[in-house]
Amino acid sequence: MSFSSKVKSEVCRYDDYSKGEAIAVLSAVMKASGTLALEGNRKISFKIITENPAIARLIFKLLKKYFDIHTEIMMKKSNSLKKNNVYVVSITEDMGVRELLKTVGVMKNEDGIVTLSYDIPEFVVKDDESRKMYIRGAFLGGGSVSNPEKMYHLEFVTHNEDYASNLRDLINTYGLNSKVIQRKNSYVVYIKEGEQVVDLLNIIGAHSSLLELENIRIIKEMRNNINRLVNCETANLSKTVNASVRQIESIKLIEKQIGLSRLPENLREVAKLRLNYPDESLKELGKMLEPPVGKSGVNHRLRKIEKIAEELRKEGR
């Protein structure tokens, strides 16, 4: 099961709603994944289509409990290439679909023409809990969240630009920074930062999934920190090795051209130690001197040796 499906299944296990909260959930689900159909004799029907059976069962329960609508769940094969099962909840004229659509703020009637409303009515999101439940419904109807092992991305797919903007504004009342982009014929409200994805999961009540994501975030951060440390250590080691090789080349050049005995005693001591201990750090070389010398002192002497070697190279010796 994908992480997105796990989140939706977790959220659907909660079904203790007040009627106002149930209206908010249904309103958002129906706008995200519902279709209005005109039947014969000026009758209408409404279908909610989902690939997640838990969502279909939740809709069935809410309709039965709060609206006394006894509908059915039909299962059929999707028209997509994957041929997944899809679940269809149909609400007909005889079941009271018109009253339901008005109650949840999905339908509007202009000049006798019945159309879907893409506003988010204030009476549907009148308090904090109903706002959270609306966002939950929008996620169940058209949302998805990426596998946090790979990336942090949560989105809501809508089919109307104004509705996408309204949903974005509602989400952002919780201090989030969701944005809208157009993707082919859809308008997508999305969040990309890990911390904000966590916040939104908290808003919709997906607490177990939230903890799973947080654990993944912690592990990923630890891995990144370890990788940074390893890269830093590797870079430092490479730098030390390159410096040691360069210093040894300079010392051998001096030894060949004029002999180490021509060097001042303090430089000669460091030169011999570097030849004998090519892998040691400057700090360790300094400890071997008598009296001991600090890292900067050893570095200063080796720089003098390299300068002498450079002069010999210029002279062509």
UniProtKB/Swiss-Prot annotation:
InterPro entries: Homing_endonucl (IPR027434), Intein_endonuc_central (IPR004042), Sporu_reg_WhiA_N_dom (IPR018478), Sporulation_regulator_WhiA (IPR003802), Sporulation_regulator_WhiA_C (IPR023054), WhiA_LAGLIDADG_dom (IPR039518). One of its GO terms (biological process) is cell division. The keyword Membrane does not apply. The keyword Cell division applies. Residues 281-314 bind DNA. Keywords: Cell cycle, Cell division, DNA-binding. GO terms for molecular function: DNA binding; endonuclease activity. Gene3D superfamilies: Homing endonucleases. Involved in cell division and chromosome segregation. Belongs to the WhiA family. HAMAP family: HTH_type_WhiA. This is Probable cell division protein WhiA. It comes from Clostridium acetobutylicum (strain ATCC 824 / DSM 792 / JCM 1419 / IAM 19013 / LMG 5710 / NBRC 13948 / NRRL B-527 / VKM B-1787 / 2291 / W). The lineage of its organism: Bacteria, Bacillati, Bacillota, Clostridia, Eubacteriales.
